[in-house]
Every structure is written in structure tokens, then in C-alpha cells.
Design a protein with these regions (language model features):
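Intrinsic-disorder/low-complexity, polar/charged segments enriched in Ser/Thr/Lys/Arg/Asp/Glu/Gln
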Residues: 1-5, 62-64
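Compact, glycine-rich, soluble single-domain proteins
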Residues: 7-58, 90
């Protein structure tokens, strides 16, 4: 299963708006994606806004994205690019 470490670009982290944008993007992908804090936290379903909010990811934190299935690398590319942006300013 491919993984990516990504530094979160949103200045205040994955609060309601950025988490919603992220989970909506993950929900549209044809593969299963998980997200976890890079410090060894539990991986959660990237399609669930409640699970993503529960990670308490702050701006500048590093997360680990993992995807399973055909197209996993492309899915990770898309979500990595999304998380690196400051979604609070969009």
C-alpha cells in the first residue's frame, strides 16, 4: 500500500472547512484512503470528516496518507497537493 508523508499547509490545520474540502476530495476517489498523524497515530478513513477532525491536525503538522487499490499513487498525488495548500485562504 503506497504511503506519503505530507506537511499540512493550512495555517490552522484541518479544522472544519479544510477537513471538509479534504474529505470531499477523498470521497470522490476510486480507492480507499486513510490519514494519520505522522507521530504514530491511528489511521482513519479519509472520507469521514468526523474522523479527520478527531485527529486534531494543526498547521505545519505532518500526516501520513495511505491508499489501496488501482490508482493509489494518483490518488495520493491529488490529496498531497490539496493538503499542501492553505485551504483557509481559498
Amino acid at each position: 500500500m503506497p504511503e506519503r508523508n505530507v506537511k499540512v499547509g493550512s495555517s490552522v490545520g484541518l479544522h472544519a472547512r479544510p477537513a471538509t474540502i479534504f474529505t470531499q476530495a477523498a470521497s470522490k476517489l476510486p480507492v480507499k484512503v486513510t490519514i494519520a498523524k505522522a507521530n504514530g497515530g491511528n489511521a482513519v478513513d479519509a472520507r469521514s470528516v468526523l474522523f479527520v477532525l478527531g485527529l486534531d491536525v494543526r498547521g505545519g503538522d505532518e500526516v501520513v496518507l495511505a491508499a489501496e487499490g488501482d490508482g493509489a499513487d494518483a490518488a495520493l498525488d491529488e490529496l498531497e497537493a490539496l493538503l499542501q495548500r492553505d485551504l483557509d485562504k481559498e
